[in-house]
Amino acid sequence: MPNPNTADYLVNPNFRTSKGGSLSPTPEAFNDTRVAAPATLRMMGKQSGPRNDQQQAPLMPPADIKQGKEQAAQRQNDASRPNGAVELRQFHRRSLGDWEFLETVGAGSMGKVKLVKHRQTKEICVIKIVNRASKAYLHKQHSLPSPKNESEILERQKRLEKEIARDKRTVREASLGQILYHPHICRLFEMCTMSNHFYMLFEYVSGGQLLDYIIQHGSLKEHHARKFARGIASALQYLHANNIVHRDLKIENIMISSSGEIKIIDFGLSNIFDYRKQLHTFCGSLYFAAPELLKAQPYTGPEVDIWSFGIVLYVLVCGKVPFDDENSSILHEKIKKGKVDYPSHLSIEVISLLTRMIVVDPLRRATLKNVVEHPWMNRGYDFKAPSYVPNRVPLTPEMIDSQVLKEMYRLEFIDDIEDTRRSLIRLVTEKEYIQLSQEYWDKLSNAKGLSSSLNNNYLNSTAQQTLIQNHITSNPSQSGYNEPDSNFEDPTLAYHPLLSIYHLVSEMVARKLAKLQRRQALALQAQAQQRQQQQQVALGTKVALNNNSPDIMTKMRSPQKEVVPNPGIFQVPAIGTSGTSNNTNTSNKPPLHVMVPPKLTIPEQAHTSPTSRKSSDIHTELNGVLKSTPVPVSGEYQQRSASPVVGEHQEKNTIGGIFRRISQSGQSQHPTRQQEPLPEREPPTYMSKSNEISIKVPKSHSRTISDYIPSARRYPSYVPNSVDVKQKPAKNTTIAPPIRSVSQKQNSDLPALPQNAELIVQKQRQKLLQENLDKLQINDNDNNNVNAVVDGINNDNSDHYLSVPKGRKLHPSARAKSVGHARRESLKFTRPPIPAALPPSDMTNDNGFLGEANKERYNPVSSNFSTVPEDSTTYSNDTNNRLTSVYSQELTEKQILEEASKAPPGSMPSIDYPKSMFLKGFFSVQTTSSKPLPIVRHNIISVLTRMNIDFKEVKGGFICVQQRPSIETAAVPVITTTGVGLDSGKAMDLQNSLDSQLSSSYHSTASSASRNSSIKRQGSYKRGQNNIPLTPLATNTHQRNSSIPMSPNYGNQSNGTSGELSSMSLDYVQQQDDILTTSRAQNINNVNGQTEQTNTSGIKERPPIKFEIHIVKVRIVGLAGVHFKKVSGNTWLYKELASYILKELNL
């Protein structure tokens, strides 16, 4: 930063101030070829000594020396004339410290406001740049001739004092902003004084001005205006309790945050008031100024804020100001008379409040206490608007802190520390203050349940010291000490301005100290963890070096190299294992580096629910010793990976993370590549003969790993001719660290989990399954299927959401790329709440991923030719029938809300992540509803189910596909409905009406071929790879496909729409091209994947109608809306279908 005493932001560095106070060029200017140069290093404060012109390179192209002399002489002549002042250009700063200036968001006569961004933290704030008035005036005076007489000198001195007063107001605004701490007051973090400007760093309020909001929306409903009014009243209570008056309260100075809360800004006209004195400064905006200001009458302070508050409230509920006229004189008279017209739509209560606030006589005007306690302000609330004043205690001379006084001096609240100390002692020893303090402690003692009253020596008692400490640290909203009381005057609130400033500064110092202590504690904790990690690494290295086995050295060297540079991996110290194992020889084996998961409970996924786990829950204390006896553990936990938060943080800070992301697309070409060890991960289970997997693996399927697979954990795939999972290891083989290849081969030499891991996990699974079975009342046959699911989950390569526990940890390479570039699959699969966690019976067969390798069929879910078992259709239809029966039930709204309340967080993504919109007039009565979101969601699912529309629930809504029968309906069985409430006749009427809308020319061969080629061109932009599944097969359990197959070929592809659903998502959820990726719309019913327009019976197929239903939350008005969006298909049919769905929804 430049030094204000040595550097000014002038254009030409050759001009220096002469002794007479005027600017004149130095002789060096005549020898310098640079006539006008930008700011040099000396101006920027980077060069303190005299500049050597001959050694410094020119900053501009050289000019003619003769011309430079003439220009310099001309400037010297201009300086001698009164109107020939030298014009000085200001230096325009582009950054301040680590804050980079982005854009100007506001400007005025005093300065401008710029949006800034921190280089390291990327935090967004705003900087208010205010001109230093006195410095600008002095610069201007330097260019003028010297005063000629004494009167001119006095006039200039008076003007200078006026400019200095302006700077004092700016400094006062900055000082008050730094000590104020209230949720409805915009924070001021720091102020920096430069040579010509003041820079004030403010909190960024992204919602805009309340003025813009009123212009856009007009007058507000009273319950919305009440929310804003309570925020304003809360902020004014805080200010007035600290002897601060705003004096410029208006809708332009009230901001709205992104969460809908108000923030008061612009304390440039604020001042400190005293109830014993009066103020004489008349300031404010004309429309919101109190009549006593226009009449130039002295005032105390709070009453002018009450008047302005009343005008603001009137604007909120009426959409206009109460006093308005083009002529300012007439406007003055209207304000002084105070006659207000109230519209007829206002309630009696709000009119009653406004008529008490907008009163010309300040003595008859309502106080802030009356406003806060008014019935209109508290309608719909159980409490009055809080002031958020922290708990305070009356001061004594012994409690005055020198550190607080120094901070007050630094902020320029006081001029002398010792004088202020004496003033404070005089105030706290006044008889009135001591009496109020005694009453305060008596009242507090009664509130705390203490029988004895406090005497004058209460501070010397240990019990009373404890009382003071507990009172200060308690919640102000619970203590009730600062509630207004007509019979009691609180000595800690607005007793004297000096005491109030002392309390505010003391609280600011306490906040800074607490923040510093937290930072120091985090730093010490990080250092301790780093030392512990270094000790663990050193111990592991020592053990490895002392071992003579070359196999162990080879297997241990790679993970240790990965552990050293990564401070985020914490491992348990290596401890020798017991020699009781029958399968391993531990006499010459190094100890295992195994991680124990901090919790075996299974919380919700961090990336699928807003209520994600805290990092403190992830980095809990690790257990110490693991028994070496291998225990049979479910393969589900063989590849437990770290939390997505931890993994993402580590990948951002490691070169390996960059290469890992780059190499995601090519992993399938390197089946033997190893990956670095995982933080907080359980190693794979040691597979021995004594702990065989209880599930048979009759089939195997090779699955490649892609960056588009949203697996939270990757199960080992079973590749043909790979290592047998039951194979017994060699007698002297060692337990190597986990090795994960891209093909996910099973390794027989893997360490075991803790002995109690399976027990706890199985108990939790049984508990979850039992709750779901009790809720849905599944029969004994379904119970057998569920048990088979639990046993067979080890062989499941797809990530079934209905059986995945909450909050599973993610490997860093398996996480989504970023929040802004999230994979669409990871944003889709969540658990529908009403069939709470129904395990589909098709999971036992894996529905294709464990099918025979020689039976290849087109699998729309994985968008490739994967193996699908022949009986996959049976399971899918059974699951869909179950879901149909559940959502077809006529449930009451109360039952729906009860089911929704029992659902875990993130299980209803369509309403957990609704899109908020402010567009007025965008929705109609038909597309909006005042019903709760769970009821709207249930109605949508019920209607789609009754209409046999395949759908998938994703974040923010539903993705739907309407499969239509072919033209020649006589050759194909008629589609029947399985839903309850929509009979066959009604379904056929809808079907016939939709069929009649479609002309036969639309289904001509030429049109189909053209459409097919168009879809293929879209698929060329797909950011995926062939043979890479886009979604886990578990998506079938979240879709509706209750249609009876039209043909044997179609029956084998009952899940055909799943592929289309997996390729689409809502636009605002993801940022990829997800309209149609291939020509799968034409070959859904084609077993061999051939792109044909006719099925095996020669019947022409009609392209399906694909559309999205967005669930939108309309802000302010509190309504839920639905928004339809067509993806593909006939537009006229889509319009008719959407209209029919809206009619059935009956929102």
From Swiss-Prot:
Biased composition (Polar residues): 14-25, 1023-1061
Enzyme class per UniProt: transferase
Recorded catalytic activity of this chain's protein: L-seryl-[protein] + ATP = O-phospho-L-seryl-[protein] + ADP + H(+); L-threonyl-[protein] + ATP = O-phospho-L-threonyl-[protein] + ADP + H(+)
Record membrane topology: Peripheral membrane protein
Region (Disordered): 1-83, 572-591, 629-687, 730-749, 860-882, 1001-1061
Binding-site positions, ATP: 105-113, 128
Compositionally biased intervals (Low complexity): 576-588, 1001-1013
Molecular function in Gene Ontology: ATP binding; protein kinase activity; protein serine kinase activity; protein serine/threonine kinase activity
Domain KA1 stretches: 1098-1147
Coiled coil: none
Role this protein plays: Serine/threonine protein kinase involved in the regulation of exocytosis. Induces phosphorylation of SEC9 and its release from the plasma membrane to the cytosol.
Protein name (Swiss-Prot/TrEMBL): Serine/threonine-protein kinase KIN2
